[in-house]
Swiss-Prot record:
Disulfide-linked positions: none
Biased composition (Basic and acidic residues): 1-19, 413-433
Residues binding GTP, per UniProt: 197-202, 370-373, 408
UniProt protein name: Mitofusin FZO1
Cytoplasmic domain ranges by topology: 1-705, 758-855
Upper classification of the organism: Eukaryota, Fungi, Dikarya, Ascomycota, Saccharomycotina
Phenotype upon changing residue 523 to H: Abolishes respiratory growth. Restores respiratory growth
Family matches, as InterPro entries: Dynamin_N, G_DYNAMIN_dom, Mitofusin_fam, P-loop_NTPase
Designated gene of the protein: FZO1
Ranges where the Dynamin-type G domain occurs: 184-467
Species for this entry: Saccharomyces cerevisiae (strain ATCC 204508 / S288c) (Baker's yeast)
Amino acid sequence: MSEGKQQFKDSNKPHKDSTDQDDDAATIVPQTLTYSRNEGHFLGSNFHGVTDDRTTLFDGEEGRREDDLLPSLRSSNSKAHLISSQLSQWNYNNNRVLLKRSILKTQAFMDQLQEENNIRPIFIAANDEREKLHVLQLNIKLDGQYNTKEKNGFNIEKKALSKLFHSQIVSVTNHLNALKKRVDDVSSKVFITGDVNTGKSALCNSLLKQRLLPEDQLPCTNVFSEILEARENDGIEEVHAIPLNIAPTLKEAIDMYSIQNPKTYEIHTLKELPDLVPQNGKYALLKIYIKDDKRPASTSLLRNGTVDISLIDSPGLNMDSLQTAEVMSRQEEIDLVIFVVNAENQLTLSAKEFISLASREKKLMFFVVKKFDKIRDKQRCKELILKQIRDLSPETYKRAADFVHFVSKNGDELPHYHNENDNEDHGDRKPDDDPYSSSDPDPDFDSLEDSLRNFVLKKRSLSKLLPAKTYLSKLLSDIIMISKSNMKMYSEEEIKINEQLETLRPEILSARAKCNDLTTSVDQMAEQTITMTYNNTKEALLNALDVPLHEYPKYQGLGQIYDFIFSTEAFIANQIDESIGSSELFAKQKTDLLVKKIYEIGKNELGDDFMCERVFRSELMFRKRKHLIGKRLKVSLSITDLFAPTWKGFLSYLSWQKPVTAPLPDIEGQTNEGQIGLMKYLGLKNYPLTQYWSRPSLLFTSKIPTLTLYFLGSTKVVGNIILNGIKLSSWSSLKKLSVPVIVVGSLLGLTYLIHDLPRALPMNLSIKYKRKLQELDYIHLNAQRTSNEVRDVLRVPTREILRSCEIIMDKKQITKKELENKKESNLLSIKFFQSLYEGTVAQKLMVEEINLDID
């Protein structure tokens, strides 16, 4: 029982450890001795109103001898035993408090590790045998092999390891919680396990001295069975079966089971055990309550008068993977492991895996090697099994005499044990039944029983608290090792980071200077091309109307003067459009050349860092409508635009000098040199003769009107001179002479204006358009439009150069920033692990100083 009082009743037999019969006879044996676990000491004789009980020996009270009652005597041996028990209990309680504090402190360390691992993944040396972890080791199994056992173990990325380590921390934290519960619990749980069909149930029956659990040559225990003293169930012997529909897993069954709540279990009799233990598909856990009151406390295991003990019989390890996993997990909740080994098979792989897991906290485990009598070479069998135990549990190997027992009898046959299940009425027991009165001596099994009782009862601190101390010591050692390895790793990383930063700084300066030079050079080339296109457009428009007269539309006579005016105006507008088109073509060519050059420079200077997938198409430039101001490029016409007389032109016309328009090539069919000379003399070379015939007004462009006026005028003047020659000096003669002169002159002037019209109209329109261009600032606006288009196009490659340079600089700056952040993070980690290391070392020293050997 975990609380209350326990009474040790007189066995009427000498203690089995006594060697001197006379001493036994002289020893005063108490009739009743009451001990309170809650108070931690033995109770006085006046407890519950007991006064002057001369059959009780405590605090000077009287007892009786083994053969007859004697007067009250003080026994110095009993007094010493009482003091020793109280000191042992005080030492146990003190160690329990220290361990609880250490567990809480270690949980705080694990929380800190978890927080650090979430922020900065913790480094775990998975393949380093020199820094092999015990509890926090990550055994990653791949293709049937563990990474820690391979020389060239596979490597896992750091973040992936940190996630695995997170799961390990959660598992360790849960284990620490289980440890804390076990330290608080005053009862002890003895876990009997082993491979399938090794006789675990038979061993359990042997320890209980009764055939309680079913035994068979085939595996029959499939459900975890925990055997407890019936006092915890009001003295009623029965089975509490926790079904799977209430608790699907073993852990849930343990947590949900409550003896005060019948809804959490089913009640069965002990007779039904053979039918219950195989039903792992129906039950998760069996709680078996039996009475172990037919034996004295000195030999009873469950009712020993010192501590509540429960035996747990488990399914075989290698029978089912799910059950094996449950057995593995159950070891965290028990205090002592009794591992049953078949001498013929020795320790299997599943057995080794369980022992390795359990040895994290349990330095000492009992090994019971059964069927040893069937082995021919017993010494060799012992050596092989002990060698396996030495590798898995070194402390157990060192104390093999107490913890490794080779049992010759297989335990399957118990002819000397009374089978309580054979009674029709289980509660009907004969008081004089002696369950082992006919038992034959078995030194091997007796040695096992003595060692087990001595370890569980007399060395309670070791059996109950040593697993917690061992686990804490190993866990703290792991934390120390992890702290040291991480501090070392971060210190080495800091050296590398400093070297990388020293190398990176000049690279950044060089890249910045190179990018500045490159972008400046590209910008200058772009500005030069933009300026060139601006000047070219401006110059083209300025020279657009400086066209030779012969390139203007041909004059077709007065009858088609309107067409001549319209065609001349259209010609001037077309000249302006052509100059704009030529300037745009020039801009396209220059832009195309520069874009290719910029891309080539970018690839040569920046290499693979310059990535441009754009394809420049110059034909897509200037696809927008011409400048809107071109719609207003219209001039008004007047009659005066047809004339532009000059004295020089008039005198040239009168003197028959060079013609107004340039001569055309020889007209087809006019091959006679004399005829050509005559037409040239008369000014008829500008048009074919047929046009002069069809359009008589074209004659005004020749010399015929002048010759006609000259001929008529000279005839009139000469006739007047001949008729009035002697009167030339008289006023009347001059008056008569001036009339024909004025008429001829007027006619000559009129013919000159008509003759000059093919020159005057183009010249006047050209002057008007030039003024209009200046008035509208048309030249500058179009030059600006062209240069802006070039600027927009060149902005793409220049920006790509700039962007590539920025990417290069950003990469280096990001690398630098990452290194600096990594350095800062490493410093924080070093500081964290330094603090964790110091705290863990101090805590480990405190744990190591807890002395559990004093009982």
